[in-house]
């Protein structure tokens, strides 16, 4: 069975994450609260970057997105939503959680809560920050 990934956010980052996951042969669901963003992903952003839309990627409005049974959940939404969505994503108990930078604002209490919750869920939590 293929590795299953849910990507929250159908903007630039969501498209990059979706393409990278498909290159690895993973099953990909992209979810967004804005149905117009999902349509832009399918008809504009993804095809412009990668040559054509990948019919193996499934698009869902957030309220219709499948819940649970994901190996990984990736969060590529606007920064002010990261920590809230990450905490909610952990309720699905994925094997791994990737949150794009920044994880949270300057108050690190929520970050500590996230890592404690991830540990209790046996989920590996990562922050996407690759500037070295």
Each model region followed by its residue ranges:
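Beta-strand-loop-alpha-helix segment that lines the small-molecule cofactor/substrate pocket
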Residues: 72, 83-130
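Short acidic low-complexity segments
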Residues: 54-70
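Phosphate-coordination loops involved in phosphoryl transfer and adenosine-cofactor binding
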Residues: 2-4, 70, 94
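Local beta-strand N-terminus motif with an aromatic residue
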Residues: 27, 70-73
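Amphipathic, non-transmembrane alpha-helical secondary structure
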Residues: 15, 19, 35, 39, ...
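N-terminal Rossmann-like dinucleotide-binding module
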Residues: 1-51
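Aromatic "clamp/platform" in nucleotide-sugar-dependent glycosyltransferases that forms part
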Residues: 78
